[in-house]
Regions:
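Flexible inter-domain linker/hinge segments
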Residues: 208, 215, 377-409, 523-538, ...
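Glycine-rich phosphate/ribose-binding loops and adjacent secondary-structure elements
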Residues: 330-332, 425, 429-440, 444, ...
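Short beta->alpha connector loops at strand-helix junctions that form conserved
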Residues: 41, 448-450, 469-472, 560, ...
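Nucleotide/phosphate-binding sheet-loop regions of phosphoryl- and nucleotidyl-transfer enzymes
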Residues: 1-389, 416, 422-425, 432-437, ...
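Structural motif
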Residues: 238, 408, 425-427, 446, ...
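Extended, non-globular alpha-helical segments
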Residues: 394-434, 485-523
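Conserved alpha/beta-domain cores
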Residues: 93, 517, 527-878
Length: 878
């Protein structure tokens, strides 16, 4: 029996999203529960994968099944594809298993040609509608299938409106639209070299192929990387009978949410346009009306829609994002999905759904994307500064937050200015999916057109970016990179501030303050902490960082980088003296100047942590990073050392390395200069003793971490220095104190010999930044030059420095955990690379049995939630 690549909506259900994609599975589910859905079928994600395996061709087997299901649709609808008597028109939409709003391409009104449009015009008695559908189809097909840019057609529309003296597309007559369709086809022929296709089946296969192709377009690739959506998933294609919202004033189209996606409030929020097609709302071309006004225009359809909203939310137990069309007063549902929402809304909805009995606490914790918590910690406008400011304009508060920066008018400029370290606000007439990289680079987005459900608003909410849309008072001049608002002209580089909660726009920069964490945040985090087994620590070198991390729920310091403490002005001079010393005695004299500073730093950290664990990594970077580079500083050092400038320069030159990442650094420094390790040990132990004396009820157990071990004898050598020094300090103080000595596991050889290393270590901590560099054999600082090409070639899907490589690096980690614990059952194991704040990496750490992850302070909530989700999923999956 042939493999099944196509399913009628009536053959699927919501559990088949891996095969049918999210949109197809939900269309099937809505069909099954009796909602008014235009009939159609779904071409599976497997067909998309097969398309790529067959060299970007749709094979004969899949083509035959598509044609078979077109015939089934004809039977169901009583219409025929490409027929002149009763033509069937369809939409072709993408639908991956994970929602990707605005990332993929859609075609409406497929099946039209010059003859069919004349039949429709005559039979419907509505020629304007028929020609409007045809000109839209030509434009969409040209853009999506043949890659002729929309802009060429927009110019023709603008010229026609100017010629006819009208402002809106809906004011153009049937004759105007017929003329436009002719112009569009001429434009197509000029760009492509052939006539616009008139055969319905040829159109359909071109459209299906285009949707498959769009899975690999640049904006889809960017969105997938940002949202951890694997390339291998592919997209499904939904072919659906058209419902027309553009037949006249008793028709319309809209998008709605069962709850407010910006705040989470339990009230329907949405927008609709009369005499329009679906893409008009989400594309943000016209600014739509609030959904409540639909009650006046289409009272019966509105009443039915309110009931549908209730049915869908009760069915899916989550906030729904729905697309619908009203044709001649009759409601048709085109889509439902779990709606994108801001982080504050996600928390509010999750807490409310538990209170309403829709979700358990476990399910509520699983609802929230940990990465979105980041946005809760973003700055807000200072209340006093905001009160003193007067808005110069107002739009729709489409995605909350505060954004201020310099104005730019294109996504490319936003990226370029951001790369130069400038904060920018991207101002656009209307946002298109191609702007995604610019939206990522900008602090916030301001659009002239579009509503709360436009592409800009939906994607901004998903990214946690502040967005104000639909500020129609702006007179935009994109060509000259300026706009006028409230009588003032703003040029590229001028500063504005926007408030994504209120929709207000302000001249200049308004002071921002750190966000306050809401009660819902505390509730969700409380639930998360109940379920997780993985501890979450922080990477912190200063008391301020440590305090902030504790505020956000950190349970200790997993990495304190001591080298950062050497760079301060009052101690760098002494450290440079140490580097340029000739003997161990001279080095010790210089290090003794630094000792009280280091001790003071550690005491402050112990105070900030109040007895929680503090893991201190000994000096790691190569010495050349600490030496002076300017002539003046070199002369000052020579004077302090009483050495000629030439000798100091020779010492500095001697520190130069061809590959410093793999050079004289980490434990190699401690082997060469054991006095450095001895000084740092004294500082750690003395600080701990003083803290313990001040706070006898605190459990102060210093953790000393020796970096870059690749050979067990290195660890034994440096540990011997540490233990002798520490024991002598403890004995001299006359106290009893426990301490631990462990190592960073960041060299592949350390993973391979973890069994031996574990016998001599109290703990392991994976330094996954270096472990990734050394396993792949490329530098984190240089990888950016070629990773883009690797993404394009599908060699990598993600940056291995941001998302842990579980296949290679992960295999080494798993081996080190298993071999380490087999030889030292008490071994405590954590991770302190950047991966400690990445949700998928945190899940991997849970699954291989780590005790803790450590991440930067502001990523602590992300890791807490990710750890809880990992524990819940592991329990559910047995």
């Amino acid at each position: 029996m042939a493999h099944k690549y196509v399913y009628l909506f009536s053959e699927g259900n919501a559990n088949m999203r891996n095969l049918l994609g999210g949109k197809g599975a939900n269309l099937a589910e809505m069909t099954n529960i009796g909602l008014p859905v235009p009939q159609g079928f779904t071409i599976t994600t497997e067909a998309c994968t097969q398309y790529y395996e067959d060299g970007r061709q749709i094979n004969a087997e899949i083509t035959a099944q598509i044609m078979e299901y077109i015939e089934k649709m004809e039977e169901i609808t009583g219409k025929k594809f490409g027929d002149l008597e009763n033509p069937l028109l369809v939409s072709v939409r993408s639908g991956a298993r994970a929602s990707m709003p605005g990332m993929m391409d859609t075609i409406l009104n497929l099946g039209l040609n010059e003859q069919v449009v004349e039949v429709l015009a005559e039979k419907s008695g509505n020629p304007r509608w028929a020609w409007d559908c045809y000109r839209r189809f030509i434009q969409m097909y040209s853009d999506v299938v043949m890659e002729v840019g929309k802009k060429y057609f927009e110019v023709l529309i603008d010229q026609m409106k100017e010629k006819k003296g009208v402002k809106l597309d809906v004011e153009l007559t049937a004759e105007d639209l017929k003329e436009l369709a002719g112009q569009f086809k001429a434009e197509y022929k000029e760009k492509i070299g052939t006539d616009f296709p008139s055969d319905a089946k040829e159109q359909l296969m071109g459209a299906v192929k285009a949707v498959f192709r769009s899975w690999d377009n640049p904006r889809a690739n960017v969105y997938r990387r940002d949202n951890d959506i694997p390339y291998s998933w592919g997209t499904a294609v939904n072919v659906q009978a058209m419902a027309f919202g553009n037949m006249g004033d008793d028709c319309g189209t809209g998008v709605a949410f069962t709850r407010d996606p910006a705040t989470g409030e339990k009230k329907m929020m949405g927008e609709f346009l009369t005499n329009a097609q679906g893409e008009d709302v989400v594309a943000g071309v016209r600014t739509p009306m609030p959904i409540a006004q639909m009650a006046e225009k289409f009272p019966e359809a509105y009443e039915q829609f309110v009931k549908v909203c209730e049915i869908l939310e009760n069915h899916y137990h989550d906030m729904q994002d729905m697309e619908f069309t009203v044709e001649k007063g009759k409601l048709f549902m085109l889509q439902t999905r779990n709606g994108k929402r801001t982080a504050p809304a996600a928390l509010q909805i999750a807490v409310d759904l538990v209170a309403e009995g829709h979700k358990t606490e476990e399910e509520a914790v699983l609802m929230i994307d940990p990465r979105n918590l980041d946005t809760l910690l973003h700055p807000q406008f200072d209340a006093k500064a905001l009160k003193a400011a007067t808005p110069v304009g107002h739009g729709l508060g489409a995605s909350p937050g505060a954004a201020c920066g310099q104005i730019v008018f294109s996504a490319e400029d936003a990226e370029r200015w951001n790369a130069d370290g400038k904060k920018v606000v991207l101002v656009r007439l209307e946002n298109s999916p191609e702007d995604i990289t610019g939206m990522k680079a900008a602090q916030g987005i301001l659009t002239v057109r579009g509503g709360m459900t436009s592409h800009a608003a939906v994607v901004a909410r998903g990214m946690g970016k502040c967005c104000v849309s639909g500020c129609g008072d702006i007179a935009m001049d994109e060509e000259n990179k300026e706009f006028t608002l409230a009588g003032k002209t703003y040029h590229e580089g001028d500063c504005i501030s926007i408030d994504g909660s209120t929709g207000n726009i302000y001249d200049g920069l308004i002071k921002t303050v750190d966000a306050e964490i809401s009660g819902n945040f505390g509730t969700i985090m409380g639930w998360a902490d109940k379920f997780r087994t993985l501890k979450v620590r922080t990477n912190a070198d200063t008391p301020a960082d440590a305090r902030k991390a504790r505020e956000l729920g950190a349970e200790g310091i997993g990495l304190c980088r001591t080298e950062h403490m050497f760079f301060e002005a009052d101690r760098i001079a002494a450290f440079r003296e140490m580097i340029c010393s000739d003997t161990a005695t001279e080095r010790e004299i210089a290090l003794n100047k630094i000792l009280p500073y280091q001790q003071g730093d550690f005491e402050q950290l112990y105070e900030a942590l109040e007895g929680m664990p503090v893991c201190i990594r000994f000096l790691d970077p190569p010495l050349h990073e600490f030496v002076p580079t300017s002539e003046y500083e070199i002369e000052q050092l020579a004077k302090a050392q009483q050495k000629p400038v030439s000798e100091i320069k020779a010492i500095i030159q001697g520190l130069h390395e061809f590959n410093p990442m793999m050079g004289h650094r980490g434990c190699r420094l401690a082997v060469t200069y054991p006095e450095i390790a001895a000084m740092q040990t004294k500082a750690v132990i003395r600080a701990a003793i003083n803290t313990m004396k001040k706070h006898p009820d605190w459990n102060v157990v210093p953790e000393i971490m020796i970096p870059l071990i690749g050979e067990v004898k290195e660890l034994k050598y440096v540990k011997d220095v540490v233990v002798k020094t520490a024991d002598a300090e403890i004995a001299a103080a006359g106290v009893e104190m426990q301490y631990q000595v462990g190592t960073m596991i960041e060299i592949p050889r350390a993973c391979l010999t973890a069994d031996e290393i574990a016998k001599n270590a109290d703990f392991f901590c994976f330094g996954t930044n270096d472990l990734t560099q050394m396993t792949f054999g490329f530098s984190r600082d240089d990888a950016g030059k070629f990773l883009g090409a690797y993404y394009d070639a599908k060699i990598f899907e993600n940056d291995p420095f941001a998302k842990l490589d579980q296949t290679g690096v992960g295999k080494l980690m798993r081996m080190a955990v298993n071999d380490g614990r087999a030889n030292n059952p008490k071994l405590h194991i954590g991770i302190c690379g950047e991966h400690g704040g990445d949700p998928s990496s945190v899940e991997f750490c849970h699954n291989i049995g780590l005790d803790y992850v450590s991440c930067s302070p502001f990523r602590v909530p992300i890791s807490r939630l990710a750890a809880a989700q990992a524990a819940i999923n592991a329990k559910r999956n047995g």
